[in-house]
Protein backbone atom coordinates (compact mmCIF):
# COMPACT_ATOMS: atom_id res chain seq x y z
CA UNK A 1 0.00 0.00 0.00
CA UNK A 2 1.17 3.50 -0.83
CA UNK A 3 0.28 6.30 1.66
CA UNK A 4 -2.81 8.09 0.34
CA UNK A 5 -3.59 5.33 -2.15
CA UNK A 6 -7.27 4.68 -2.79
CA UNK A 7 -8.56 1.17 -3.38
CA UNK A 8 -12.25 1.48 -4.30
CA UNK A 9 -14.52 -1.53 -4.48
CA UNK A 10 -15.01 -3.14 -7.87
CA UNK A 11 -17.90 -1.90 -10.00
CA UNK A 12 -19.60 1.46 -10.30
CA UNK A 13 -19.65 3.86 -7.35
CA UNK A 14 -22.60 6.20 -6.90
CA UNK A 15 -21.86 9.51 -5.21
CA UNK A 16 -24.39 10.98 -2.78
CA UNK A 17 -26.76 8.07 -3.33
CA UNK A 18 -30.26 8.77 -2.04
CA UNK A 19 -29.77 12.54 -1.76
CA UNK A 20 -32.58 14.52 -3.38
CA UNK A 21 -31.03 16.94 -5.88
CA UNK A 22 -32.27 20.37 -6.90
CA UNK A 23 -31.00 21.83 -10.19
CA UNK A 24 -30.48 25.59 -10.39
CA UNK A 25 -29.36 27.83 -13.25
CA UNK A 26 -26.31 29.87 -12.21
CA UNK A 27 -24.73 32.77 -14.11
CA UNK A 28 -21.39 34.44 -13.43
CA UNK A 29 -22.13 38.16 -13.83
CA UNK A 30 -18.60 39.14 -12.81
CA UNK A 31 -15.46 39.79 -14.84
CA UNK A 32 -13.40 37.03 -13.20
CA UNK A 33 -13.79 33.26 -12.91
CA UNK A 34 -15.49 31.98 -9.75
CA UNK A 35 -14.85 28.53 -8.32
CA UNK A 36 -17.11 26.86 -5.73
CA UNK A 37 -15.95 23.81 -3.78
CA UNK A 38 -17.87 20.60 -3.17
CA UNK A 39 -18.91 21.33 0.43
CA UNK A 40 -19.35 25.10 0.28
CA UNK A 41 -22.80 26.34 1.40
CA UNK A 42 -23.91 27.30 -2.10
CA UNK A 43 -26.33 30.04 -0.97
CA UNK A 44 -23.31 31.95 0.38
CA UNK A 45 -21.20 31.63 -2.77
CA UNK A 46 -19.58 34.63 -4.48
CA UNK A 47 -22.05 37.53 -4.99
CA UNK A 48 -21.08 37.68 -8.70
CA UNK A 49 -22.99 34.41 -9.15
CA UNK A 50 -26.63 35.08 -10.01
CA UNK A 51 -29.09 32.36 -8.90
CA UNK A 52 -31.99 31.72 -6.49
CA UNK A 53 -30.10 31.95 -3.20
CA UNK A 54 -33.16 31.21 -1.07
CA UNK A 55 -33.70 27.94 -2.96
CA UNK A 56 -30.01 27.08 -2.39
CA UNK A 57 -30.19 27.58 1.39
CA UNK A 58 -28.80 24.49 3.13
CA UNK A 59 -27.48 22.96 -0.10
CA UNK A 60 -24.07 22.13 -1.58
CA UNK A 61 -22.89 20.99 -4.99
CA UNK A 62 -23.66 17.37 -5.92
CA UNK A 63 -20.07 16.60 -6.96
CA UNK A 64 -17.24 14.46 -5.61
CA UNK A 65 -15.69 15.60 -2.32
CA UNK A 66 -12.64 17.79 -2.79
CA UNK A 67 -13.60 18.92 -6.29
CA UNK A 68 -15.06 22.23 -7.48
CA UNK A 69 -17.12 23.83 -10.24
CA UNK A 70 -15.66 26.82 -12.09
CA UNK A 71 -17.87 29.53 -13.59
CA UNK A 72 -16.16 31.63 -16.26
CA UNK A 73 -17.19 35.31 -16.66
CA UNK A 74 -20.53 35.49 -18.49
CA UNK A 75 -21.06 31.74 -18.29
CA UNK A 76 -24.48 30.26 -17.42
CA UNK A 77 -24.91 26.64 -16.44
CA UNK A 78 -27.20 24.36 -14.49
CA UNK A 79 -25.78 22.81 -11.33
CA UNK A 80 -27.20 20.01 -9.18
CA UNK A 81 -27.35 20.75 -5.45
CA UNK A 82 -28.00 18.39 -2.53
CA UNK A 83 -28.67 19.02 1.17
CA UNK A 84 -25.72 19.56 3.47
CA UNK A 85 -25.58 16.46 5.68
CA UNK A 86 -24.62 15.76 9.25
CA UNK A 87 -25.98 17.98 12.01
CA UNK A 88 -26.99 20.60 9.39
CA UNK A 89 -25.20 23.41 11.23
CA UNK A 90 -23.37 26.06 9.20
CA UNK A 91 -20.48 28.15 10.54
CA UNK A 92 -18.07 30.38 8.65
CA UNK A 93 -18.39 30.81 4.90
CA UNK A 94 -19.83 34.37 4.67
CA UNK A 95 -21.23 34.20 8.24
CA UNK A 96 -24.83 34.43 7.01
CA UNK A 97 -26.12 31.43 9.01
CA UNK A 98 -23.74 30.73 11.93
CA UNK A 99 -25.79 27.91 13.43
CA UNK A 100 -28.66 25.57 12.65
CA UNK A 101 -30.24 25.53 9.21
From Swiss-Prot:
One of its GO terms (molecular function) is urease activity. It catalyses: urea + 2 H2O + H(+) = hydrogencarbonate + 2 NH4(+). Pathway: Nitrogen metabolism; urea degradation; CO(2) and NH(3) from urea (urease route): step 1/1. One of its GO terms (biological process) is urea catabolic process. GO terms for cellular component: urease complex. It comes from the Bacteria. Its main location: cytoplasm. Pfam families: Urease_beta. Keywords: Cytoplasm, Hydrolase. SUPFAM superfamilies: Urease, beta-subunit. The keyword Cytoplasm applies. It is found in: Cytoplasm. Its EC number is 3.5.1.5. HAMAP family: Urease_beta (MF_01954). PANTHER family: UREASE. Heterotrimer of UreA (gamma), UreB (beta) and UreC (alpha) subunits. Three heterotrimers associate to form the active enzyme. Belongs to the urease beta subunit family. This is Urease subunit beta. It comes from Ruegeria sp. (strain TM1040) (Silicibacter sp.). The lineage of its organism: Bacteria, Pseudomonadati, Pseudomonadota, Alphaproteobacteria, Rhodobacterales. The gene is ureB.
Amino acid sequence: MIPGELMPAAGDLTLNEGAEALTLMVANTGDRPVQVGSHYHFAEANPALDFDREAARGLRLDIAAGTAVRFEPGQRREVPLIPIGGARRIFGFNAEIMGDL
